[in-house]
Structures are given as structure tokens and as C-alpha cells.
Amino acid sequence: MQKKQVAVIDVGSSKVTAVIGERGINKTFVIKGRYSCEYDGFENGTFFDVHKLKRVLSSVATSLIKACRGKLQTVYVGVPGDFTKVVMKDSQISFAKKRKITEEDVDALFDAAFVMPSSQYTLINRSAIVYELDDFRRLANPVGAVSEILNGKLSFVLCSNYFIEAVKPALESAGIRNVECISSALAEALYLVEAETRDRIAILTDVGFITTTITIIQGDGLVYQHTFPYGGGYITAAIVEKFSIPFDVAENLKRKVNLSCVVTSSEFDVLDGENGYFYPINEVKNVVIKSLDTLCENIASSLEKSGFIVPEYVPLMVTGGGISYIRGAKEHVSGRLNCVVEIVSPKVPLMDKPTESNVLSLLDLALEQK
């Protein structure tokens, strides 16, 4: 029997990554193909260069089709938090008498709750925070339970039509017949955060290259999401501005920083081609610390805007490639925000890096939906 195989595209803030994969053993994946292209990214819900994005999408789509020998029908595209909004609704349906709840009843509960609030958005995902029966039992899945009433606190994720109109035609023109958009934030929440943790409440922060998305999760749904324009690339840009050096040299310099250890020398050495450069360690660290402080201020502001009172014991889970590899960044953010910080990543051998979180989360959700 042939295994189920899917293709996903992760539209990140610095590159587009396409993957073809199927389920492996012990919740792993078998990757059949992977293709990446850098592009200019996005900020505040707008792509910097839509035409370049379309060329990149067309290129990775062509690679996917070739890898599947022309048999690829559907591609699942992850929608970044910058292009989505979360809507929460309470819903209730009643029956003439007590009976077993079916999948159709659950669909009816969702249908009764949702009315599209704007013509500028399209519904891409819906999931439940919690269901409740007539005896006040709260369940993650009510199908098969007996009740006269079904209540639900429901979460809906909407995608900006601007994103769909930028992405879908480019993929269709390359030969993809069906393009399914799914929320990247929801995919990460369901894949990276254990169900028991989600049943209480969890905070996931995806720090990317240009943007950062804060998500509050409960049950199987998102209860809050906010994206702001500040990521790892801003830290690199601050180093560029401080030392007037090329961006790639600044990126290399940033990767040498260790905020946790006591320095034993006074300078970092960085090679750029055949040339060697030296930069004061303390000055570089101060630039990184100042940038991390700005990131922390944005995170604190986002959580305050949510209106949710999150218990102090709930850790701030951090993923993505923005700050995860900066040694000592986790401890600095923890001290600055006065909370426990955990770096989370896929529990998959050879792919257990925060930079893999988004694409593997999309792959997991796409396999569940297919």
C-alpha cells in the first residue's frame, strides 16, 4: 500500500521553502524532495516585491511537479501570521432529545457560529478550543458523547485575500491544480505544543528573520495572534549600522556572540573572503542585547494587548531562526520578561532545529488534512 504523500510550501519572511514528504515511523517524516529560494520577504501584511515572489513560487512549484513526475495535484501553502487574523466565537446547538453527537453535528456547530466579517478575508482553518455538553462536561472531541445540547468555544483563522491573490495564481500558472492555504501559526501550535499543555494554555513565539508572531493557544485552537515587524534580521541590521559593515559579515559576527559566558579576549575575528576583520566583543554584545531588549518590549506589548491573564508558570515557547541560535539569548529574554523561556523545535532526528519548525508543522497538518 502506497503511503500518503503531500507537498507544502512555507512562505517565510526571508525565503520560500517547498517540501514533499510522507509519514515515517515514530512520528517522523520521510522527505522526498526539498527546494528553497530566497526573496525579499514581507512586513505589515505586504510583500516587498510581489513580482519576485511570484517568480520564486513558480520556480519551486516547477521543482515539485518534476519531483512528483507530473502527478502533483494539490499543494498546501502556509500562511504567515502577518496575513491572518483570528476570530473567536461561542456557539450552541440543541437537539429534540438526548442522542449521540455526530461529525455532522460538530460541523453544524461551526457553521452556526461563523459569518465572514469582511470581504477582504477568506476562512482557511477552524478548530475548537473546547466543547461542552448539557451536563457541563468539557471535551476535546464530543463525537460519540450523548447530550441534548452541544456548546463550543470555537476559533476561526482568516487569510488576507491579498496573500491568496499573490500566491495562488503563481502556483496555478506553474501547473498546480489545487492550492490549499493553512495557518502556519495553527500548524506550529498543534505540532510543537503537546496536547496536555494546550488544554491549559500555551504561548508560542515564532521569531523569524523580519517578523515575529505571538500566538496564545488553548485546546486545538488559537485564541490570540499578533505579528510585529521585528526579527533576527533587525539584530543583524543593528550590527551593520554600528560598524558600517556588509550584511553577511554582520550575520557572521552575530553568530559568534555568546551572551552567557565571560569573555577571555577583547575582539571577535571575522573572515570576509581573503580579508580578516576584528570587532570589540563588548560593543558587539551591547548591540545584540539592545536589540533583544527591543524584541522583548514588543513581546510584552503584544501579550498585554491580548487581554489574557496568563499564569506565571506558563513558559514562553520560542521557535524560528531569528534568535534561537544566539547563545545566551534565551536566558536574556527570560530575565527581561521575568518568565521561563523554552526553545522548541521538531522532535525529528536530523531536523530537530527551530528553523525547521514551520515547514515540518505544515507537513504534519497537511498530512492530517489529506
Predicted regions and their residues:
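Extended hydrophobic-aromatic, low-complexity segments
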Residues: 224-226, 236-239, 309-312, 326-331, ...
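Nucleotide/phosphate-binding catalytic cleft detector across ATP-hydrolyzing
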Residues: 1-15, 19-202, 222-223, 260-289, ...
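Acidic-glycine-rich active-site phosphate/pyrophosphate-binding loop
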Residues: 30-31, 207-211, 327-344
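A short, acidic, amphipathic alpha-helical segment used as a generic capping/interface helix at domain edges
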Residues: 294-307
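Generic beta-strand/beta-sheet core signal
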Residues: 78-80, 184, 207, 217, ...
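Short, contiguous acidic/charged loop-to-helix segments that flank catalytic cores in large enzymes
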Residues: 286-287, 317-321, 345-353
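Acidic, glycine-rich loop-and-beta core segments that form the ion-binding/anion-interacting portion
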Residues: 193-261
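Glycine-rich phosphate-binding/hydrolytic loop that grips phosphoryl groups
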Residues: 342-370
